[in-house]
């Protein structure tokens, strides 16, 4: 029975990781927001910042989520791209449901009696930041499909990884949208698709070019995650109410920003019904995963 319970726990954590991973490759959707919605944000931040002090404990906590994120990114990159290109509204409402389904645990973290001017300002400013990002016209931004790699470009990829990873773990801020605004989104996601396809077909020769781009990007991601995680942990310890109000502003604005970014086209009854269904599915998934999380986030 203990073994079955352990397997169930790990599968639950891997599934959350899949959701977080998929969120990180969609412009306008935040992996950090999904961490909050899944009820694991504080646990993951603590494990990252205490990786060297509590090495095995942190590895044990992080591993299933990392595995899930890799599965989500590699397995669903093509599917999500297809969904956004052909069924953008239902795809985005799925993630809006995932966001809103996990809001309750975050709200419970805020001590309403301690809400003051600083907390209100943090909420308003960060809410406005996400709306501003949502208003950016992603269709007008030039994104190269491929990049010729050299020493200078590798350094740029490391820096991009640092910026993108930092935004990936800040709730409400989309690392993919930041990459798109900087003009590198198509190149990075294209490399991920190529690598995933080559891995699936065990084609080592085809892995060379995407690895050349993704490896320095991955190094930057690791460096960026540690830096931002340390900052977030310090803020939640020093200014918990203002910090969580700010996080709530980031998360609460995300569905609106995502809708702003969505190309509605010509709405039909079938499309609206599909959007409602995917929203309900996303909401239910987030609610259930947050409910069964060990962390009462």
Regions found by a protein language model. Give the residues of each.
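Multi-pass membrane proteins that catalyze or facilitate reactions on polyprenyl-/lipid-phosphate substrates
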Residues: 2-24, 30-169, 173-297
């Amino acid at each position: 029975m203990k073994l079955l319970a352990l397997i169930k726990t790990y599968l639950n954590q891997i599934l959350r990781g899949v959701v977080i991973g998929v969120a990180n490759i969609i412009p306008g959707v935040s992996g950090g927001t999904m961490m909050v919605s899944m009820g694991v944000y504080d646990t993951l931040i603590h494990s990252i910042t205490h990786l060297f002090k509590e090495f095995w404990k942190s590895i044990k906590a992080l591993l299933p989520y990392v595995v899930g994120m890799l599965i989500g990114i590699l397995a669903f990159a093509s599917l999500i791209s297809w969904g956004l290109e052909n069924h953008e509204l239902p795809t985005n409402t799925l993630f809006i449901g995932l966001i809103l389904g996990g809001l309750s645990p975050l709200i419970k973290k805020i001590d309403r009696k301690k809400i003051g001017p600083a907390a209100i300002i943090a909420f308003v400013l960060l809410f406005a930041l996400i709306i501003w990002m949502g208003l950016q016209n992603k269709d007008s931004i030039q994104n190269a499909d491929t990049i010729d790699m050299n020493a200078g470009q590798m350094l740029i990829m490391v820096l991009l990884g640092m910026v993108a990873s930092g935004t990936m773990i800040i709730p409400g801020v989309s690392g993919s949208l930041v990459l798109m605004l900087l003009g590198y989104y198509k190149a990075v996601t294209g490399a991920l698709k190529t690598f995933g396809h080559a891995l699936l077909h065990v084609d080592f020769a085809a892995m060379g070019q995407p690895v050349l781009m993704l490896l320095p990007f991955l190094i930057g991601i690791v460096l960026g995650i540690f830096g931002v995680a340390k900052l977030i942990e310090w803020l939640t310890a020093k200014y918990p109410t203002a910090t969580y109000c700010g996080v709530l502003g980031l998360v609460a604005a995300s569905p609106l920003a995502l809708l702003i970014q969505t190309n509605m086209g010509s709405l039909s009854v079938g499309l609206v019904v599909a959007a409602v269904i995917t929203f309900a599915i996303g909401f239910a998934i987030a609610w259930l995963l947050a409910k069964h999380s060990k962390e009462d986030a």
